[in-house]
């Protein structure tokens, strides 16, 4: 259970989803193993993986507090298959679990391993300052982390996570897939709602006023090249993503949030992400952080019933990225 008695346990909700993923490994084309004392699930490195695996991994990332579906219709006509994400507790699901906020690197060996950890394991370790703002900590006997990586974590990373969570390595499951894979690209696009929550947090909106949220973005086709694959998943959200947040706020605050969330607020908006990445010579820190947002936002005030819009879809840029 969580230390906040009014909030659900992310790990209690996500645990059955993890076990179901493992049980269905064969039909989802996954490889389950024991490595460095922990259970690992390869969803796209040496395993072929699948879109369905990516969909289910995204629900694990959300800590069991959200649903992820693939819909046959979407806002970008030429790419109709759409990842739809919904959560009745989007702050905890997206920021408390799905956000890839835990930096994990091999600091003892020479593997060069680095990945950002997302999922309910973050809420057990609470190594990020964000959890002080959320006022949340989860207690669990087993946990899981999702890594955007082409390899399993080395022993030093497994031990680091075990120490931070207070759990033995055998009680931690690492699910990993590179962005180039079917599962990897799907679970990244499923972050369309999460980036809106992150932007709301960045601009200082009161997170307690966000009641519900839904988002969608076109399912990006995978690409064998990492830069192109990363570009496509980002472009799906930046130029094809749409979110609607329901807030307990007055019209002025709702309108301002709708205007602040979209990627159009970024000076880097207007070109495919791979092109932007090349322009800054691969230095993420030179990219305006405001770009990592959905293309369009709708914010509805439950106090007044009025809805406000900001941003715009850019289907031509989605096309330029996906073809």
Swiss-Prot record:
Q: Which UniProt keywords apply?
A: Cytoplasm, Hydrolase, One-carbon metabolism
| InterPro entries in alphabetical order | METHMP_CycHdrlase
Q: What is its EC number?
A: 3.5.4.27
Asked whether the keyword Hydrolase is assigned, the reply is: yes
The record lists the lineage as: Bacteria, Pseudomonadati, Pseudomonadota, Alphaproteobacteria, Hyphomicrobiales
Q: How does activity depend on temperature?
A: Optimum temperature is 40 degrees Celsius.
**Which pathway, metabolic or otherwise, does it act in?**
One-carbon metabolism; formaldehyde degradation; formate from formaldehyde (H(4)MPT route): step 3/5
Q: Output the Gene3D superfamilies linked to this UniProt entry.
A: Methenyltetrahydromethanopterin Cyclohydrolase, Chain A, domain 1, Methenyltetrahydromethanopterin Cyclohydrolase, Chain A, domain 2
The primary location reported for this protein is cytoplasm
Q: What's a single GO CC term here? A: cytoplasm
Its recorded name reads Methenyltetrahydromethanopterin cyclohydrolase
